[in-house]
């Protein structure tokens, strides 16, 4: 139907008002035509056989052979006119009604189409509003739990472990193990990290110490692997210390009980080479290890372990492993990453603190990485009461330590020192105070370290002296007090140290000794304490901040401190002189004999 037909149909029944628009009608010659000739003449010309005679004034009407009277003729003509008018009206009304019906139908169809479009628009708007409301709810949920996420196509967080069954079809035995272990609701890091890994996305995650990061990567790994196979290791977990690796291994074994997964840890490289070598049956699924032992196996010819089937590579305490120098494992990690050649491999980095180097590396090397952090970045746990204690000098530290012992404390207690030598010195000083104290450091054998950790967990040891490396990730349940005997070299190290207490929502306390020599490092640690809501002396806030170069220098080369000893200097110098005399006498030459 074109525009002309539409206009014609819409104009049905419209009449032109000749009286009102007479001038326009005359201009366009609209109206009745006035004839200036007699119609009888026309009729007479048409009578070829001369049968009829013209009647003047008949206006073209022909007379019949039998003429009717004027009255009857008038009545008959009126009746005929009425009939003709009725027929015309009927025909016109039928035509009009048909046209109106078709017009109405067409208009109704147009209206229906317009209504359909409006409904679709409403539906679109409704779906858009629903999506917007859903996003607002998710943002509210994340803000409530202090979850910060960066990335594209972010998976929705979970609020309960039952959602893993509803949305991801978790193994019923695995879910039961989670609930039996006492984990009723997921922690904030678990709420977001678990869905991210279940969607196969690469991850950089940071959360406070004791917030459940081990469970955050253990659950999705076990769900992803689904069931045991004989393809070799399909998941690899790297940690900086053997103690932390042992802890992760223990948690995974508990979590996977009854599922059949074979979870291994490298204790001795020689045994591992035979067990996991090329001639092995490959009846294993998950490996937990430290970098050095794994590198030793990879460098053998042929390699003592095959990582080509690894689908998930998790690096725990990633900021420590990415450090340069003797304490870091950056070179070893590069070799491990290259050994995992599967096209399915995904990587996840977990830590309590964000390191700039790790974040930049992840953004450059990981595919569509999602960054998840809980709380403020590089902040301490809010459940820990933090205190700075000025002790004046190195001698004052030991006096303050003994004062704490006299006042009484609630064990277990962790004491952090700067080096292995200082750990030994402090151990020899405290062992005579009548308290159960022990020390753990790298110079002790693995068996001694394991026994010490086991005794500390069992409550047989009240005070454990250790170096900073032990602060990484190890979960000592129920630690009530952390003492930073030597001031930490950075705010990151401080966060990891005090994170050994106040875990899983429990309250804890951290006391940090500082001397005049620690003044350059005070400002950064004081900021962390203040952010956690703990009081900081006003004069410390006025100290200058260290430049980044100075910070790195302090980390690589810590302050040289005096030896830990309460023996007065007079007796120390006297003993020193005595040793010199003894050594001097031993060096004296015997006089030659007189031969004459």
From Swiss-Prot:
Modified residues (Phosphoserine): 39
SMART domains per UniProt: DEXDc (SM00487), HELICc (SM00490)
Domain Helicase ATP-binding intervals: 194-372
Motif (DEAD box): 316-319
Residue ranges with Basic residues bias: 577-589
Gene3D superfamilies referenced in this protein's UniProt entry, alphabetically: P-loop containing nucleotide triphosphate hydrolases
Motif (Q motif) on chain: 163-191
Region (Disordered): 68-94, 575-596
Modification type N6-acetyllysine: residues: 15
Domain Helicase C-terminal as annotated: residue spans: 383-544
Family annotation (PROSITE patterns): HELICASE_ATP_BIND_1, HELICASE_CTER, Q_MOTIF
Any Pfam family the entry gives: DEAD
UniProt EC number: 3.6.4.13
Main location: nucleus
One GO term describing the cellular component: nucleolus
Annotated localization: Nucleus, Nucleolus
Catalysed reactions, semicolon-separated: ATP + H2O = ADP + phosphate + H(+)
Keywords, comma-separated and alphabetical: Acetylation, ATP-binding, Helicase, Hydrolase, Nucleotide-binding, Nucleus, Phosphoprotein, RNA-binding
Residues given in the record as ATP binding sites: 207-214
Molecular-function GO terms, alphabetical: ATP binding; ATP hydrolysis activity; RNA binding; RNA helicase activity
Similarity annotation: Belongs to the DEAD box helicase family. DDX52/ROK1 subfamily.
PANTHER family listed in its UniProt record: ATP-DEPENDENT RNA HELICASE RHLE-RELATED, RNA HELICASE
Protein name: Probable ATP-dependent RNA helicase DDX52
Organism: Bos taurus
């Amino acid at each position: 139907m074109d525009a002309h037909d539409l206009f014609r149909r819409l104009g049905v029944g419209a009449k032109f008002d000749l009286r009102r628009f007479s001038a326009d009608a005359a201009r366009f010659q609209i109206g009745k035509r006035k004839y200036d000739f007699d119609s009888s003449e026309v009729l007479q010309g048409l009578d070829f056989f001369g049968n009829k005679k013209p009647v003047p004034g008949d206006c073209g009407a022909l007379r019949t052979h039998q003429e009717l009277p004027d009255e009857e003729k008038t009545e008959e003509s009126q009746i005929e006119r009425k009939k003709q008018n009725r027929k015309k009206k009927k025909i016109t009304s039928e035509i009009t009604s048909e046209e109106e019906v078709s017009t109405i139908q067409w208009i109704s169809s147009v209206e229906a189409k317009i209504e359909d479009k409006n409904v679709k628009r409403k539906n679109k708007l409704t779906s858009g509003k629903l999506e917007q409301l859903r996003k607002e709810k998710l943002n509210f949920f994340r803000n409530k739990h202090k979850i910060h996420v960066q990335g594209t196509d972010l998976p929705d967080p979970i609020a309960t472990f039952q959602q893993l069954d509803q949305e991801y079809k978790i193994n019923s035995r695995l879910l039961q193990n989670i609930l039996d272990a006492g984990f009723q609701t997921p922690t904030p890091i678990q709420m977001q990290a678990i869905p991210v890994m279940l969607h196969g996305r690469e991850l950089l995650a940071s959360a406070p110490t004791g917030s459940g990061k081990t469970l955050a990567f253990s659950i999705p790994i076990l769900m992803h692997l689904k069931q045991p196979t004989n393809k070799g290791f399909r998941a690899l977990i790297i940690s900086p210390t053997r103690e932390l690796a042992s802890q992760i291994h223990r948690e995974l074994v508990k979590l996977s009980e009854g599922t059949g997964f074979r979870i291994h840890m490298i204790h001795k490289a020689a045994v591992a080479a035979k067990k996991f070598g090329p001639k092995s049956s490959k009846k294993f699924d998950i490996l937990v290890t430290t970098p050095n032992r794994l590198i030793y196996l990879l460098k053998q010819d042929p390699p003592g372990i095959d990582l080509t089937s690894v689908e998930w590579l998790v690096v725990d305490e990633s900021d420590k492993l990415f450090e340069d120098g003797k304490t870091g494992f950056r070179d070893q990690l590069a070799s491990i990453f290259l050994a995992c050649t599967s096209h399915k491999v995904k990587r996840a980095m977990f830590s309590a603190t964000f390191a700039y180097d790790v974040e930049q590396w992840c953004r450059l090397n990981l595919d569509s990485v999602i960054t998840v952090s809980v709380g403020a970045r590089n902040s301490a746990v809010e459940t820990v009461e933090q205190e700075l204690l000025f002790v004046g000098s190195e001698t004052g530290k030991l006096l303050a330590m003994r004062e704490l012992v006299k006042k009484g404390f609630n064990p277990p207690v962790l004491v952090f020192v700067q080096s292995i030598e200082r750990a030994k010195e402090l151990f020899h000083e405290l062992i005579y105070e009548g308290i159960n104290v022990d020390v753990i450091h790298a110079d002790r054998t693995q068996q001694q370290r394991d026994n010490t950790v086991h005794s500390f967990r069992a409550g047989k040891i009240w005070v454990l002296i250790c170096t900073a490396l032990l602060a990484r990730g190890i979960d000592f349940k129920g630690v009530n007090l952390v003492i930073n005997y030597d001031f930490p070299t950075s705010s990151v190290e401080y966060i990891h140290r005090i994170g050994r207490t106040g875990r899983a929502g429990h309250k804890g306390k951290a006391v940090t000794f500082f001397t005049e020599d620690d003044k350059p490092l005070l400002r950064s640690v004081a900021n962390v304490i203040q952010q956690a809501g703990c009081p900081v002396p006003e004069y410390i806030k006025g100290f200058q901040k260290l430049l980044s170069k100075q910070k790195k220098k302090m980390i690589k080369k810590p302050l040289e401190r005096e030896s830990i000893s309460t023996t007065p200097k007079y007796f120390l110098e006297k003993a020193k002189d005595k040793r010199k005399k003894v050594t001097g006498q031993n060096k004296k030459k015997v006089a030659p004999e007189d031969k004459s």
